[in-house]
Every structure is written in structure tokens, then in C-alpha cells.
Curated annotation (Swiss-Prot):
InterPro entries: N_methyl_site, PilE-like, Pilin-like, T4P/T2SS_Core. Residues 1-7 form a propeptide. Disulfide bonds join C113-C139. This is Type IV pilus non-core minor pilin PilE. It holds the Pfam family ComP_DUS. It comes from Pseudomonas aeruginosa (strain ATCC 15692 / DSM 22644 / CIP 104116 / JCM 14847 / LMG 12228 / 1C / PRS 101 / PAO1). Coiled coil: none annotated. The gene is pilE. The chain crosses the membrane at residues 8-28. The lineage of its organism: Bacteria, Pseudomonadati, Pseudomonadota, Gammaproteobacteria, Pseudomonadales. One of its GO terms (biological process) is pilus assembly.
Amino acid sequence: MRTRQKGFTLLEMVVVVAVIGILLGIAIPSYQNYVIRSNRTEGQALLSDAAARQERYYSQNPGVGYTKDVAKLGMSSANSPNNLYNLTIATPTSTTYTLTATPINSQTRDKTCGKLTLNQLGERGAAGKTGNNSTVNDCWR
């Protein structure tokens, strides 16, 4: 009578490797999308902070209007704390401004939302779209 050998067969190993490959093929892109979505909050925070500083500057400098200079807003850098977004201020008027957070470094992989915008009325935008559409709402949640 033959004794049964212990261990895994080559076929069993191939099946295990295939299952792991399939799981990784699903898990890694899902995780990367999660990281990109969670990093958007940094761009949103950058815009909200800059908007509050714009309003403070506007109220402390009557007759001057809004500024394009981030240094005048008391910001040490135009980049977000983790260097995921860069803040730009479109040429402001005495009564309007538009802030844009442009993704930089690893956040440039965000193809869904891309640039986030915020204006003096509190209107949010994303990927060149403004208003209350699903893309903007998804990007700002």
C-alpha cells in the first residue's frame, strides 16, 4: 500500500496564485481610487481656507477689493500641506474672485474631478463644471 504524499500539487499552487492575482487586480485599483477621493479633501480645505482669507482681506482693506497675492492672504505657500494641490487665484475684481486648486504630484491621477474651484458666492466647481450637477456634487462630498 502506498503512502499518500503530503503537500500541495502544482495545480493547486497555480489556482492559488490565480485567485490572488484576481483579488489584487480588483483591490489595488479600488484602493488607489479611494486614496485619490480622500485626497480631494485637501484641495477642498485649501480652497475653503483661501476663501475665508479672501473675505478677511476684503473686509480689512475697504475699497481695495480682493487680492491675487497669496502672501497678502497670510498664506506661506500656494501649495496644500501635503503638496497635492496648488492654489491659483484668477484675476480678481473689486467684487469677485475664483480660486482654483490644481492637482499636483500624485494627485494628478484624479481624472474624474481634476481642478476644484470656489468663487466668492461659494459656488463650487470641478473639472471645468460648475453648479449643482452630479460631477460637482461627487467631487465635493
